[in-house]
Amino acid sequence: MTSRGPRERAASEQVLRLRRLWEEHVHRPFPGTGTDPRLQEVALYSSWLGSIVEAALEGGALDPLHADMLKIHRAEGNRELFRAGGELGDPVRSYVARLITIEDILISLPVDK
């Protein structure tokens, strides 16, 4: 039996936290309908982030390409996403907050070599 160091344990805990939050997220309905471009922005972000989450959960770490994509996305900011959450009210605001929490967890995962 091998013992894991503090870094590996922390990474495992973050993966478990990500899995729980993602499972909660995918089992909740999308908070809006219609053709509002702000809702479409939120849906697009959710889909994009979801593909990164699924890969990270499968491998237990962040793919290097996904890590780069997340860094670029964070550098560009979430202005449109924040605006949509603020303007569309509470169900969307809560949904966006959960997505940003998921993104924060992803960023904290180790990057696969």
Predicted regions and their residues:
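Charged, low-complexity surface segments at secondary-structure and domain boundaries
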Residues: 1-8, 54-59, 82-84
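N-terminal leader/targeting helix
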Residues: 1-25
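Generic serine detector
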Residues: 3, 12, 46-47, 51, ...
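Short, solvent-exposed segments of well-ordered alpha helices
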Residues: 9-16, 36-43, 61-64, 68, ...
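Amphipathic alpha-helical interaction modules
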Residues: 23-76
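Amphipathic alpha-helical binding modules
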Residues: 81-113
